[in-house]
Every structure is written in structure tokens, then in C-alpha cells.
Amino acid sequence: KRNIKIDWDAGNLKVSFARLDNGNSYYSSGREASGLLHLVGILSALYDDEVGVLLIDEPEVSLHPQLQAFLLKEITRVAGIPKQNDYKKIIVMATHSTEMIKISKTDDLLSFIFCNDLKEAPIQIPKDAGELQNKHLKSLVARLGQEHKLVLFSRTPLLVEGPSDVIICNALSDKLDLNLEAAGSQILPINGKEAMSETVKLFRLMGKIPTVLVDADAFADSLNLVRDYFHNEQIQNAADRLASKNGHSGILALAKNIYDDFCSLVQNNWDDIANIAQNHSYFTLSENELLNKKRSALCTVLNEQNLNDDWNNIKK
């Protein structure tokens, strides 16, 4: 802890510091780290009633996390619309530090402007975005920790269901010598697939390109996640071009045809794979018999090679 003293010295401001545990003896600012010197300048501007608008570029530079947290509190305290006889001021801050980001509810995201590239216009989430009202998304935002906030600085976040998926992805990344973070990616656990679709939409509103990694049940249960993921003109057009090369009208039509054929096989040809599928953990995971059949059947189709023609053909 330190005291800061600012005095006039030959027409200039002189900044001195004193350690509280060292007899309160002041010493020259030249002995302190540059971060503390920057902090003095920022605090002076924050406390100046004559300053109505303040632009701060990377205030976290050379500051310990605790001082960053303190500075963010001071910035938040004075931020607002300036009024007469009021100390509030408009503050625009550029940062690369999660310590300088405070998010406790989805509406807080409206204060952020995302700059992805010099050649692209900055992006701000519109205040009427329906995704902000999703209860699963609200729960996710309320639980965001410092590690989770790193995804806000990522261009291509990888969305997974839970912490165990993060562990597996990191292990695979290390084993295969993949540099996910250097490539602009960051793994974010959503804690379940219920909020996955809305989270994808939210990150696209930020100008990001999310990738989704989910368990098989997300595809066996319904096509909701598939439809929501391709609910983007650029991504759907690219997928449509790939689908058309194989004679399909589009990616969503292809997905629907495959899913309908799969559900028909589960309904009419279950006995052909029952002896294998019933051994899968998915078969007893829920109380819904049809869901159990679809989930275990999908995993069986993906894992087994020696199935009859009806089940093997769906792979093609």
C-alpha cells in the first residue's frame, strides 16, 4: 500500500510515493513502476470535475490485477452522462485485460464495442437483441469468471457443453501440438446444450465466428441446433454450395432428409441393432424410451462397421 502526494515544484506537478509500512517517508516517483505513474494520471483525470469525456487506452498496462480491479471500480463509479454540478463523465476505454471487464448481467454487454479488424467496422450488440432475454444465456453470463471472459477477445470461440469437455480439448490440443489461443480461439463451457443456440447467436452479434462441440444427443434429439447454427446467411450459403455438389438443394434440406431417414430406421428397424445399441450408456440415460433409442442408435451407427445395409446406407 502506498500514499501518493502531488505538489507544485517550480511550476510543475511533482508526484511522490510513500509506503505505509515504512514510516510514511516519501520518495521520488522515478523509483516506482510505470504502471503506478500511469495510474496517477488516470485517477487525476477521473477526479477532475472539468473533464466531461475521457478516452483511456489500455489502462491495465504494468498494473497488478488488484490495482486493475481498483481502477475499474473508480472508472465505473464516475462513468455516466455529465450534468451540471456533477462529477460524472463519458468514458471510452480500450482494453485487452479481463480484469478491466465487469459483466454481471446480459444488459452489461450493450456497453461493449468489439473491434475485430482495422478493415472492419466496430460492432455493438443492438439493445433490442432477443438473445439477451434468454434465461439460459442470462444464467451463463451471471457465472462468467475471468477465464470465461477471455472468449470476448477471441475471434473464433469454441463452445463446449461443460468443464470435462474443456479438459479433453486442452489435452488433445497439447497432444497434437495445436495452438488454439494463438489461432484466435478460446474454449468456453456453456454448462449444457440448452443455451448453445442462443450463445451462438450472441457471439455472432459480436462479430465472432463460433464453433460448436456437443455430445451426440444434441443431434439425435432434434435438428434445433443444426437449424440455429446455419441461421446465418454467409455460413448457410457456404454449406449450401458444398451440399449442392452432391445433388442436394441445400444444407438444411440435406440435414432434414438424413434426420427423417434416421428416425424412420429407429422406428421401423430398431430390432436390427437393438442387441448392440442397448449396451450403450445412452440407452438408459433418460426416462424417455424414444430418446434413448435415438441416442444409442446414432452412436451405434457412428461406431460400428458391420451393420446391415439399411443402417450402413444412412452413413452415405
Placement of each model-derived feature along the sequence:
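Beta-sheet entry/capping signal
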Residues: 52-53, 90-92, 111, 157, ...
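Short, flexible loop segments at the rims of nucleotide/cofactor-binding pockets, characterized by
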Residues: 30-33, 134-138, 187-190
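C-terminal lobe/lid and adjacent interdomain/linker elements of RecA-like ASCE P-loop ATPase modules
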Residues: 73-156, 164-171, 176
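Extended helical coiled-coil dimerization/tether regions that scaffold
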Residues: 1-39, 44-53, 77-84
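Acidic, Mg2+-coordinating catalytic modules of nucleic-acid enzymes
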Residues: 144-159, 163-316
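Short active-site loops of ABC-family nucleotide-binding domains
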Residues: 52, 61-62
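Walker B catalytic acidic pair
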Residues: 57-59
